[in-house]
């Protein structure tokens, strides 16, 4: 997902092109594939959600509570929610696995300050039309605490998704994941010509290899220290290119808003958020 003056380019535009051409990207193409990663052990990331439109995987997300999924706001631009589905408990999306649970989208809450042209505040909450049954293949992922700071430069994290695994639209065998490191925000902002905001977070591969995301991975979580610290938002033309670092929505900046939405929409009492470690979550 590249930046541009209108949509910040096609999801995968070069920095030069993205900052010069007012091209709006096709919906859902921002932040598309896991590049330089590996297939995870099936169902070892039970919090992962696949958002589908027209029977096709469109974006990722993570399960916050049994009826709530967190994703990226740009994934739902010009989309009819009545045709959307959320799949939990999946590893291979092309297979009807017995672990999968499929839900419709009951409601969408986009951050009120989301800006589609710059991807500022690129976050939303999906309320499912039913409650997920938690177990080994379907589990919760916690966001940072209300007073948590974003991870510092050099912190090791991971990002997963079902997007293409090459620049040539090669489909993955199952859920893929890449290990990345948090990049200094000033360095990242310089790479993006000063167009980033304080509520964005960047990563790099940490070595000489191209590693990261590109497009149908949008909305998926960046997991650092077993917390969802980022949401896939946008990148450059070439996946994992250090010249255009991967950019995420910084979840710690929106924790109060997240729980306020859940509380206002779920008046019934429930357990305090983040009191249970997600099943199958590895460090």
From Swiss-Prot:
UniProt GO molecular function: heparin binding; serine-type endopeptidase activity; serine-type peptidase activity
Name of one Pfam family that matches: Trypsin
Organism: Homo sapiens
Any one Gene Ontology cellular component term annotated for this protein: azurophil granule lumen
GO biological process, one term: protein maturation
Subcellular location: Cytoplasmic granule lumen; Secreted
Outcome recorded upon mutating residue 215 to A: Decreases enzyme activity tenfold. Decreases enzyme activity twentyfold
Organism superkingdom: Eukaryota
Signal peptide: 1-31
EC number(s) per entry: 3.4.21.-
Recorded family membership: Belongs to the peptidase S1 family.
Tissues/organs with expression: Detected in peripheral blood neutrophil granulocytes, but not in other types of leukocytes. Detected in neutrophils and neutrophil precursors in bone marrow (at protein level). Detected in myeloblasts and promyelocytes in bone marrow.
CDD domains in UniProt: Tryp_SPc (cd00190)
Protein's recorded name: Serine protease 57
Catalytic residues identified in the record: 74 (charge relay system), 122 (charge relay system), 218 (charge relay system)
Glycosylation sites: 129, 189
Keywords on record: Disulfide bond, Glycoprotein, Heparin-binding, Hydrolase, Protease, Secreted, Serine protease, Signal
Domain Peptidase S1 positions: 34-263
């Amino acid at each position: 997902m590249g930046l541009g003056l209108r949509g910040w380019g096609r999801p995968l535009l070069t920095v030069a092109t993205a900052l010069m051409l007012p091209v709006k990207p096709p919906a859902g193409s921002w932040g598309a594939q896991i590049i330089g990663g590996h297939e995870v052990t099936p169902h070892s990331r039970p919090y992962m959600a696949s958002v589908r439109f027209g029977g096709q995987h469109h974006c990722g997300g993570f399960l916050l509570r049994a009826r709530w999924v967190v994703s990226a706001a740009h994934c739902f631009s010009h989309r009819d929610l009545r045709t959307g589905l959320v799949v939990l408990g999946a590893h291979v999306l092309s297979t009807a696995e017995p672990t999968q649970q499929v839900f419709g989208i009951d409601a969408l809450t986009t951050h009120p300050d989301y800006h589609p042209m710059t991807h500022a505040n690129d976050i939303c909450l999906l309320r499912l039309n039913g409650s997920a049954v938690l177990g080994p293949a379907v589990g919760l992922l916690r966001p940072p605490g209300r007073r948590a700071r974003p991870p510092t430069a050099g912190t090791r994290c991971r990002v997963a998704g079902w997007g293409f695994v090459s620049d040539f639209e090669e489909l993955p065998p199952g859920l893929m994941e890449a290990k990345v490191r948090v990049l200094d925000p000033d360095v990242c902002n310089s790479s993006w010509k000063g167009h980033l905001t304080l509520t964005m977070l960047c990563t790099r591969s940490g070595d000489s290899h191209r590693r990261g995301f590109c497009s149908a991975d949008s909305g998926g979580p960046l997991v650092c220290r077993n917390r969802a610290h980022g949401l896939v938002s946008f990148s450059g033309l070439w996946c994992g290119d250090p010249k255009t670092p991967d950019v995420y929505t910084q979840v710690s900046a929106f924790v109060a808003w997240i729980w306020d939405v859940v509380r206002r929409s779920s008046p019934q009492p429930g357990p305090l958020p983040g009191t249970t470690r997600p099943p199958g979550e590895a460090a």
